[in-house]
């Protein structure tokens, strides 16, 4: 029977659609009594089953179906040094970052405006994968994926304890604490 003929039958009020439904057998009180008797007899079996932890018996499952991400589980790290001559080579840098490789990008061979465009492009890709970026030198940059931690040891070497006396005098003048703002005192007294 097609959909259109069924719709016509419903609109016309024909009762032959009632034959399309199956008759359901409802449980009687006898069925419930048999169920309750079986429940009382099997209550000790149910108690032992409910006390057992279903998560203890994992021997039937394979040890692990998880596949690690490339570059994270291996101890081999790769650093790529790239010296592009044009912006057209920048997608290779992004691909290396996606493969979890650290990239040192030497842009001294490019024109300054193209180099700026390249750095912006790769910095955006690095940001998209939660990576890190550092400027190493003039037109030389380090881009690393999120699985690599980048630390800057230059800041440790340039600390005030490692500098000469001239540097210490300069730094002590520059790092003197700033005076409190005038509005800070009135707010503090008001509280």
UniProtKB/Swiss-Prot annotation:
<dbReference type="InterPro" id="IPR038594">
    <property type="entry name" value="SepF-like_sf"/>
</dbReference>
<comment type="similarity">
    <text>Belongs to the SepF family.</text>
</comment>
<dbReference type="InterPro" id="IPR007561">
    <property type="entry name" value="Cell_div_SepF/SepF-rel"/>
</dbReference>
<keyword id="KW-0717">Septation</keyword>
<protein>
    <recommendedName>
        <fullName>Cell division protein SepF</fullName>
    </recommendedName>
</protein>
<comment type="subunit">
    <text>Homodimer. Interacts with FtsZ.</text>
</comment>
<dbReference type="GO" id="GO:0043093">
    <property type="term" value="P:FtsZ-dependent cytokinesis"/>
</dbReference>
<dbReference type="GO" id="GO:0005737">
    <property type="term" value="C:cytoplasm"/>
</dbReference>
<dbReference type="InterPro" id="IPR023052">
    <property type="entry name" value="Cell_div_SepF"/>
</dbReference>
<feature type="compositionally biased region" description="Polar residues">
    <location>
        <begin position="156"/>
        <end position="167"/>
    </location>
</feature>
<keyword id="KW-0963">Cytoplasm</keyword>
<feature type="region of interest" description="Disordered">
    <location>
        <begin position="156"/>
        <end position="191"/>
    </location>
</feature>
<comment type="function">
    <text>Cell division protein that is part of the divisome complex and is recruited early to the Z-ring. Probably stimulates Z-ring formation, perhaps through the cross-linking of FtsZ protofilaments. Its function overlaps with FtsA.</text>
</comment>
<dbReference type="Pfam" id="PF04472">
    <property type="entry name" value="SepF"/>
</dbReference>
<dbReference type="GO" id="GO:0000917">
    <property type="term" value="P:division septum assembly"/>
</dbReference>
<keyword id="KW-0131">Cell cycle</keyword>
<keyword id="KW-0132">Cell division</keyword>
């Amino acid at each position: 029977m097609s959909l259109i003929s069924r719709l016509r039958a419903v609109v016309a009020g024909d009762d032959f659609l009632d034959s399309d439904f199956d008759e359901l057998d409802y449980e009687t009180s006898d069925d419930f009594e048999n169920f309750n008797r079986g429940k009382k007899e099997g209550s000790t079996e149910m108690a032992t089953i409910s006390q057992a932890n279903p998560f203890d018996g994992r021997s039937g499952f394979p040890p692990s179906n998880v596949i690690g991400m490339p570059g994270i589980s291996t101890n081999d790290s790769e650093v790529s040094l790239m010296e592009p001559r044009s912006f057209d080579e920048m997608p290779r840098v992004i691909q290396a970052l996606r493969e979890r490789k650290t990239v040192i990008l030497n842009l001294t061979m490019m024109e300054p405006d193209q180099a700026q465009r390249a750095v912006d492009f790769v910095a955006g890709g690095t940001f998209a994968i939660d990576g890190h970026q550092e400027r190493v030198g003039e037109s030389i940059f380090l881009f690393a994926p999120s699985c690599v931690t980048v630390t800057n040891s230059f800041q440790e070497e340039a600390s005030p304890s490692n500098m000469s006396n001239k540097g210490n005098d300069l730094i002590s003048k520059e790092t003197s604490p700033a005076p409190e703002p005038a509005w800070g005192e009135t707010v503090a007294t008001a509280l």
